[in-house]
């Protein structure tokens, strides 16, 4: 009522500002927030807290992680498990766990669930991990985390899931239990439990369980940004490097041909899908290492925001769409794109750890983008452009390696993680990088001086000499920043965010326009 005194628990200022109805709304919001903290004090402390693993204690699925880990790191041993695939899920889980056991310290745990378990333990409540994952995985996890009174997983012919899990729980805890789970398979268990904790996707069953008379508590869902996560996972920002596919259109003076531009645009999109698929493959293969990395652990798959299975399925769809579109556009284009895919995978799994060969491969990968633009439009192969591109991008790749070597040296590290270089190799990366940069400039100058087609294609070719001058200044700047350890990004990414680079690029573009 207006003018009525505030309740004892209502601050006078809030009561004045919001009134009785506003205060009730604030109280309801506060209670909802309190429920999000999740308090189990309403349940008898004699009731143990039973926690599921996949999707509940961790954000991912341990079976899928085990499968992909074995596929990328122990493929031969994975093939030996094929007979177990026909013996049921428990046999498959056991066989995979023997091939490559999941590293418990690398799993994406739900912090809210860990906090709930800690608070339950401090309140004197027993806690158990009961999962359909293999028993060895359950044992490893509770050994790593601590805070559990025991663990039970699948073994032999027993797949501890849904009603089989319920049967085991009722036999082991006849006086009742509180169950924390996340999926439809947990419904029979929740309905028979003394209390239900809904986690992740399990929150959608809240109303159904309340109608069934089950005492329900929910963990507040973490803020999700699926579109942002997928754009980040697909590295859409890296598609900027694929703009090189348009370079032959401008150098071949066919940028005003609508059909050529349209065809190249479709090629750009198809190739972008293939490139994004390779990033997903790389993330799936390096999952354990990424989770141990200071920044890579925040990637969508590593953090569990995108499941490994969804990542794999997206990869298959993008590869099929990208290669299929490439085949429709031009068979030679599809062939070059396939070579790029094979070379990228070889680089990701092995070649990036081989000193000097790694930067040569990077130079080749960038050059293949230009080759795609040539074959897609039936343009003649240019050894000048090919040679310049290889040397130019080898220099940029070495600039990145140089920064890594310099930083490792200044931090007095003995090795550079994931690379074939040592900190003391920085004079080598500096020398080779500057030599490659100089070679690219010399190639450009020789092309302008000796290639007859220059005078045929351009009315004022003298303006073109601005290009090697601008590229030379830009490369010198890149190497200066690299040696000072001020180059914090990939040189291409750096250029896209650098005003000086844009100015030099605009100057070179203007020179080409004047030359026409």
Swiss-Prot record:
> What transmembrane ranges does the database entry give?
183-203, 261-281, 308-328, 329-349, 356-376, 379-399, 430-450, 461-481, 492-512
Q: Does the keyword Nucleotide-binding apply?
A: no
Looking up CDD domains in the UniProt record yields: PT_UbiA_2 (cd13963)
Its protein name is: Uncharacterized protein y4nM
UniProt source species? Sinorhizobium fredii (strain NBRC 101917 / NGR234)
Compartments it resides in: Cell membrane
Provide a Gene Ontology MF annotation, just one: transferase activity, transferring alkyl or aryl (other than methyl) groups
InterPro entries of this UniProt entry? HAD-like_sf, HAD_sf, Prenyltransferase, UbiA_prenyltransferase, UbiA_sf
Q: Which cellular component, as a GO term, is one annotated location?
A: plasma membrane
């Amino acid at each position: 009522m207006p003018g009525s005194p505030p309740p004892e628990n209502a601050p006078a200022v809030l009561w004045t500002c919001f009134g009785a109805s506003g205060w009730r709304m604030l109280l309801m919001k506060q209670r909802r927030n309190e429920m999000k903290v999740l308090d189990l004090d309403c349940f008898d402390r004699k009731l143990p807290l039973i926690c599921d693993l996949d999707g509940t204690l961790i954000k991912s699925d341990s079976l899928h992680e085990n499968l992909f880990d074995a596929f990328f790191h122990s493929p031969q041993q994975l093939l030996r498990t094929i007979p177990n695939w026909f013996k049921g899920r428990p046999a498959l889980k056991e066989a995979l766990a023997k091939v490559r056991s999941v590293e418990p310290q690398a799993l994406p745990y739900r912090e809210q669930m860990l906090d709930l378990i800690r608070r339950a333990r401090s309140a004197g409540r027993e806690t158990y991990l009961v999962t359909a994952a293999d028993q060895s995985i359950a044992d490893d996890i509770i050994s790593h985390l601590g805070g559990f009174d025991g663990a039970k997983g699948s073994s032999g012919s027993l797949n501890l899931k849904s009603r089989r899990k319920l049967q085991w729980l009722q036999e082991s805890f006849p006086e009742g239990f509180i169950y924390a789970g996340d999926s439809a398979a947990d419904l029979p268990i929740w309905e028979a439990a003394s209390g239900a904790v809904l986690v992740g996707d399990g929150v959608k069953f809240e109303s159904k369980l309340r109608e069934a008379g089950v005492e329900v508590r929910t963990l507040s869902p973490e803020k999700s940004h699926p579109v942002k996560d997928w754009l980040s996972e697909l590295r859409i920002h890296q598609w900027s490097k694929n703009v090189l596919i348009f370079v032959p259109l401008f150098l071949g003076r066919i940028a005003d041909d609508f059909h050529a531009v349209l065809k190249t645009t479709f090629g750009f999109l198809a190739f972008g899908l293939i490139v994004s698929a390779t990033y997903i493959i790389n993330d799936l293969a390096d999952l354990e290492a990424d989770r141990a990395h200071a920044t890579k652990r925040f990637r969508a798959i590593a953090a569990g925001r995108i499941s490994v299975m969804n990542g794999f399925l997206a990869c298959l769809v993008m590869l099929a769409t990208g290669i299929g579109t490439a085949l429709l556009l031009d068979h030679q284009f599809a062939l070059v794109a396939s070579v790029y895919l094979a070379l990228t995978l070889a680089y990701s799994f092995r070649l990036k750890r081989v000193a000097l060969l790694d930067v040569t491969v990077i130079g080749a990968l960038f050059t293949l983008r230009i080759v795609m633009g040539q074959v897609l439009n039936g343009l003649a192969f240019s050894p000048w452009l090919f040679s310049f591109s290889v040397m130019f991008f080898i220099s940029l790749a070495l600039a990145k390696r140089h920064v890594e070597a310099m930083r490792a040296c200044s931090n007095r590290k003995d090795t550079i993680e994931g690379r074939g270089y040592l900190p003391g190799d920085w004079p080598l990366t500096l020398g080779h990088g500057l030599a490659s940069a100089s070679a690219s400039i010399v190639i450009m100058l020789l092309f302008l001086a000796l290639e007859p087609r220059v005078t045929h294609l351009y009315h004022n070719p003298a303006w073109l000499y601005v290009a090697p001058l601008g590229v030379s200044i830009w490369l010198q700047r890149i190497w200066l920043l690299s040696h000072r350890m001020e180059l914090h990004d990939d040189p291409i990414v750096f250029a896209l965010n650098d005003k000086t680079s844009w100015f030099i690029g605009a100057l070179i573009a203007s020179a080409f326009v004047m030359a026409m």
